């Protein structure tokens, strides 16, 4: 039964290549797809997930899509005994557990820090202090493109520039694009490499930066290969459509399915890199399997930018083809929001042979919409916006 700690040792597999794997956050969006792929490859998988009600609903029941061939433990990464009993016989640890929500992290500061930073610290402390009692050979942590702040930019000459965040005074006049701090000219967005200086602009982003730096640092110190994967904007089936702080594709889908306009800040031409969850899973598998990933950081994206307005229009065309809903471009802004950020994937392509396979327009969005149309999401966008607004964050 979920939540009980009468754990059996992870079973041995006949194939010597099969391993025992723990996935924290394995009932969530990315984690559950990763679990499916690991089970399919013959690995023995254990899931540790607290079934956060913001993601899984107030009854905190395991989702129907949870793989029946994986062992499920309902518990918190901050519970020392639960965490240790889940990880002590694992070979590989995928740390996906986290609270996710850039805006919400700016007022639920303690809880985001507790779960994301202290939860990771708890896991690493067990690795460090019980070294003789475990045989974990690799740890992989889910990081985020949010730690970059703004993406990379260049001048017309091609010279790279790392401008500061746009000042509120600029955006109050509807001047949305990034300006050269020296000349005032509009800068051109460029692919963002892993080497770009980090500029986290939210408590969530700060926590993600801390997670990856702690994992890499402790991994090096104890010679446990560690990998940090900086996810860009992930979309696909199993996104929490009723969570108003999740990805924009899910938020828009929830609005559209409830007959309401997706609300877009600024002018809608701000851009992100949207990657399908199946491609994110493949990146994780490559990082687990290849020594070239050890102690490295990788962007996990497509290398292509897409405007937020285009995403909204694509979802409307498929979820509300009659045209009863149109995007609502409000020309408002959220302080600290970035304008453009898309991935430079040359490193993960070169080192791990990764190539994104799912195109947003020709397959990815269709799968998301087919799944979303079968759901009955509760639209909580306005409730979340009020929470941000009363704190002056919108």
Segments from the language model and where they lie:
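Short, flexible micro-motifs
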Residues: 28-31, 78, 104, 122, ...
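A short beta-to-alpha transition loop/helix N-cap that caps and shapes the active-site region
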Residues: 54-56, 148-151, 238, 307-308, ...
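N-terminal Rossmann-like NAD(P)+-binding domain of SDR-like oxidoreductases, especially those catalyzing
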Residues: 6, 10-232
